[in-house]
């Protein structure tokens, strides 16, 4: 928007020419403003959003409103106060007075002296009555009273719409009194929310039907219903009394009804809520991808800055830098490197795409979401009705700013990005629970002693498939389903609110997926902790038994089998613990088979000495296995008990990682724990706790704490 120190005759900050008929701003097309709004990192922008969201007051002046401020007013009820900028009063009054003066002079203006839409050929001099009729015929929504289905727009979306509509009207181009905006602000500040229908708008000419119910409350229509701060149902009179509006119902002046309903505020308000959450969830998905790499023993080189610098896309570069920061210095990354060094053939040279290309996958989604955010922020600071009152040129401009195409397009794009994030999350989850891919974690992430009675996250994986399928369906565009409406006057329309509603649904599903994935990642972290403790005790026990049984012969002499210990320990080091630990000494499991294999190989190399019982390695095998069967199960059980009692010999290494704040939040603040078949608690109960935290914002601080040390740049290329 072009801003000049001296406003035009409307009293607003917008001007078109400098007095000589020349454009007064070299960014007259606003591309520079749009580009400037994208400066800095996405994470910094999210941090600013969170900071704004937590402020106690949202000042409204017709410009500078952000999606985070909309979300704050919409979701925090009386926790955030709305204040109208007094300096906007003059411009608002000027346009309102112009409408009245214009009608008194007999000027013919759409919606003031004419009918509406395709019937605008009709004429009347009863300006106030015309506005009342506008509200009456637009009250065409269905609420489903007496049925199980709810057809009412959510409370938060309605509050968002009210806030956005005030902001656009304050710019002084709509021909409406300042007192009406003050009344709407009082309803917001007293947490009184009119009931708006969920459906019935095509967001061109604006969100006519739902906004007519806000207008219906203001004029005291008998069918007007509101929800009070305690959930009580209020009629219009009760709502006015509770809000402290002493002037009584408004008698609409010419154009005021049209000014209230002919805007995109419902679609853009709900879009603001969806985007506020989406911006947070995409940062969460970056961190979850990094944690996924940690627990999967991934190779961190996929985040190397040179790779992403050569691709040039800023979203990808930032996603990689964030993951690189999480993985830098991670204990799991260091441990994985040791695994790769010991046996480079134990896993593929390259990690699978869901891990290795996660920055390339998430980067474009970040860019789409950022662009949609800026588009919606421009929309909620726009004048969206028709006609527009240009006091400075003494004319009413008949145009089409009510066309909510920026909402429909940005929401379609956002929904596609959300679906892509969910698809990546599902692919990562599927690898995590599959013991063929997860580098030693148990199948289904089972945590019990007996895997035959523990199927872990099998149900959660099925649920994730369901979530992902629905999310992919929702990714289909809304805006290509336009129907010609209102006697073919509204022959193209944006479907902005419908697209916003579908995007809000997609956000909910992504939260379901994110909460399930986060619980699974915490389970994997705990299983890595158990794995490390179990491997340690198995190595110690094998070492002790080897020293006791294999070092000396029957007469106390040094025995050739003493050289087997190193190779025996290498077997333990390389073998996945959860492949045998439920019955560590079973002859059908790989541990005992490979330990025996080592001893047999050494016996074959022992040559002629195998014929002598005092030097035969082969004859030691039975004693070694018997001793191991006596000791190892007891030691394994002892370690399990110690871990369960919070006294592990090896601490949980997540404490040493930058991802720890999120793990700590899930485990300590939300009270979740390792899921096993031996416990009563189900996966869904734990996922519900995390989902609630994603919905109410409690996850934000621990999420950002994971990145508090990041300086906003990738590690240098050395």
From Swiss-Prot:
Pathway: Phenylpropanoid metabolism; trans-cinnamate biosynthesis; trans-cinnamate from L-phenylalanine: step 1/1. There is a cross-link at residues 204-206 (5-imidazolinone (Ala-Gly)). GO terms for biological process: cinnamic acid biosynthetic process; L-phenylalanine catabolic process. Contains an active site 4-methylidene-imidazol-5-one (MIO), which is formed autocatalytically by cyclization and dehydration of residues Ala-Ser-Gly. The active site is at residue 110. InterPro entries: Aromatic_Lyase, Fumarase/histidase_N, L-Aspartase-like, Phe/His_NH3-lyase_AS, Phe_NH3-lyase, Phe_NH3-lyase_shielding_dom_sf. One of its GO terms (molecular function) is phenylalanine ammonia-lyase activity. It comes from the Eukaryota. Gene3D superfamilies: Fumarase/aspartase (Central domain), Fumarase/aspartase (N-terminal domain), Phenylalanine ammonia-lyase 1, domain 3. This is Phenylalanine ammonia-lyase 2. The gene is PAL2.
